[in-house]
Structure formats: C-alpha cells, structure tokens
C-alpha cells in the first residue's frame, strides 16, 4: 500500500542514483550527460510535486554523501598503502592453488590485498590445498600496484581489484611463519565454513563432478575448470554456473515450502527467510547476482513486484555491494532481471512465452554482450533453454542430496554422466562452430543502441516505426563490425608487440602473435593451468575490433 502512495516510481529513482554513481566513479561525458538528462526529466515531471522533490532530495543527498565518502576512502587507501608489510591474514575461501602458485585475498591493518606466493614444495602445496582455517602469513611481503589496461578491450586488472576494494598486490618473497588466526569474526566463520565445504568436495568427489558441485552449490570454480569453462563460454551458456535466479529460486523455494509444510504462518516467513538468505549469500561468495536474486525474492514476500521491486533492489545493492555496477556479472544480472520485469508474457501459451522471452532477452542484452565480450552465440538461446531445465530440475537437486549425504557415503557413480554431457557439448560445439564476432561498440555507439532499444519498446505496436528502428539497430551492429577506417595498431602482447593492419575494405594483416619461451622443466606438482599471451591480449583485441578472420599472418620471431 505504501508503494502506491509513494510520490515517485522507485525504479526511476534508482536510475537517477545509478547515473549519479557513474558520474562520481567513472567520470566521463556520457555518465554526466545521462545524469543531467535524467535529472531534467525528473524535474520536468515532478516540479510541482513537493513530496517527490523532498523524497529525491533526501535519498539523493544520502547517496551523494555515501558515494563521495567511498570515493574519498578509496583515494586515501590507494595513497597511504605502504611499500612493504610483515604479515597478512588470508580470507579462507579465497585460497586458490594453481601448480606452484598460491593466490588469495588478504587483510592487514584495515587494508585488503591480492596476495601471491610461490610454493616451495609439494608438501606446502598440499597444506594450502586442504586447509580450511583463517591463516596468518608472516615474512617479507612486498606491495605493488596492479597492472592497468594495456590494450583496447584488454583486461583491466587494476580496475577489477579496485571494484573489490583492493589497491595493492602483495607478493610474499620470504615466508617465515604460518599460524592460524586466534580470534575470528562471524564473517570469518562463514568464510571458513565455505572453505571447509569446498575442500570436502574437492577431496571426496571425482573430476568433473566436483566442479559442477562447487560451481552450482557454492559459486566456486577453480583453475582446473578452465578447459570446461572455455567450452561453456564458446557455447554461450557459462552463465548457468553464475549463481543467480535459478539456484536462489531452488534453495529459497524449497526452504519456504518446508517452512509452510511445518505449519509456520505466512506472516512469520520473512523473519526466517531473512537470516537464511544472509547465510546463503555468504556461503556462495556474496556476489552481485546472488544478492540481487535474494533481495528480489525477499521483496516479493511483501508483494513488491516488477519495476518497484527492481528499483528497491538496485538501491539496496548500492548499500550491500557498492561497486556492483563496475563488474560484468553485476551489470548482466541486473540487465536480465530488468528485462524480465519490463515484459509480461503470462497470457501467452508456454511455447510462445518461451520463444518471446528468449527473443526479448537476446535482443535486449545484445548491446551489453558486445560491449563486454564482442561476441554472441545465437544457438545459446536454445542451449540455455535446454540445459537450464537439466541444471534446475536434475543437477541441482541431485548434487544437493549427494553433498548432504557425503558425510555418510560418497556417490561418485554418476560421474560418467557429467563426462558424457561434456562430450555431448563438445560435439555440439564442433557442429555449430565458434560464436559470432560482432566487435565492441564505443560508448557513443553503445548509447545509440540503448536509445534505439528504448524507442523500440515505446513504438513496438507501430509497425512502420518498429521496422525502421530494427533496421537502425542492425546498421549500428554493422558499423561496429566494419568500421569505415584504415587501421594500423601495435598491440602489447607481453613480450614485444604485435602489429595489426586493416583496410577499409576489410583486408587484414597480422605481424607476430606474441609468445612465451619457457626454460627448463618443472615437476608435476609445479605444473599449472595457463593461458597463452594471445588469449589474454591479442585475441580480445581482435574480437573487440570485429575481426573474425586474418588474411595474412607474418611471424618474425625465432620461437615458432
């Protein structure tokens, strides 16, 4: 009832706050322009509504102070970071061992660091692989800033760490002592509990079954999953492992059903669901997609649905996970949720509803997919529909039961089923080929795409406008894929440069692809899962430029 009496739509308010966030933390002309445009639109529609002005002034003022505080604190932490520390406390469930390389998130004196350490022996590796305690590492620890973006569409590791409140990398040059932390907080307890569950799965279940169990139940995929991850990414269904609505709906739905069957009145459901949701969020890594789904589910208990639900969810996410809009997962998760809130296909038949939902989601999310990845797999719509049923109706319940019973008996007999499924997916990939390479739009092109889609939503019932707008959207995609310019680019590939040349006609020449020369051999325990320099530097650049084929390749280095 109070939502109906609210002087302003909460989703409109959330959009205004989101544009304010980007204005402060991204600070470019597009962010400032979006904020100014939304503010003018609001004032135009609510100028005479004093209640709306007061509400926006109050909420906007609070978030303005909040964002400025976060920005100032980040600046202080970056400037005041020391050059060296002598001990760091590791967050238990962030420990990752890849061959001889140990990585984790650590904390020391109010600062958070990305910690790296080169393991000295197989015994040391086994210890860090199997421990579930909060460890304090003491020794000589050098701090350094992370590497920023080196190429167009290259991964900006510095910005990625900054979105998690991390401004320095900590390299342990000499490890003197490893001791368990004595006094642990409630938050550290959940980190240890999650780590204990992950270690239990990794040591008791075979591969690849254990990867599906850690991924679907706890939102964790280790380096050993890289090969399968490339397969799922190529097919466009890697998002099935990103915990969100499917998993939250399963666990929260069954927990709610159990409470009702036990006779708990509906009026008391929220009191029990709230702490359960908090624990579930912590056990799954406290990610943006999980928090978004949990908040929306809890708000639905009060009858808050559609855009009001989405608006309040966005405002709460800014409090629980301030920089969620700087992460790919946060943006894509909220974009999918917004599209589902915006359209209503309930009156359609199940088949027609499924087709329309897939088409709307694919078209609405396409600008974001091209902006972040530069690729799109059309068959992913069909595969998502197929495998979401398999994951939701079979894998999730079965893996949950097997994990719960694993303290008594280990069910590894169905591991061949996972091997067969991956073989089947490999066959599908060989049949359908690689994703379409569409290129990455500039911010200007991206804004034009969003504007066209907004107008398409408004004028959908007018056929002439609809066809015209769809043609404009298609032309924008062609513009991104085939820029009308000649190009000569030097790409930093880690060891030297690669030179890329392209003419307006689309003819391409690539000189060198980068590489890494390794000297000597390593013991088996030291071998790590690695990706080539080209996969991290050159290939993302070519995909961002819409290049799907190289006409001429010239190699000048001797290590071919």
Predicted features along the sequence, with ranges:
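Hydrophobic secondary-structure signal with a strong preference for alpha-helical segments in membranes
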Residues: 1-239, 466-560
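Alpha-helix C-terminal capping segments
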Residues: 21-24, 81, 106-108, 198-205, ...
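Juxtamembrane/interfacial segments around transmembrane helices
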Residues: 56-64, 81-85, 103-106, 185, ...
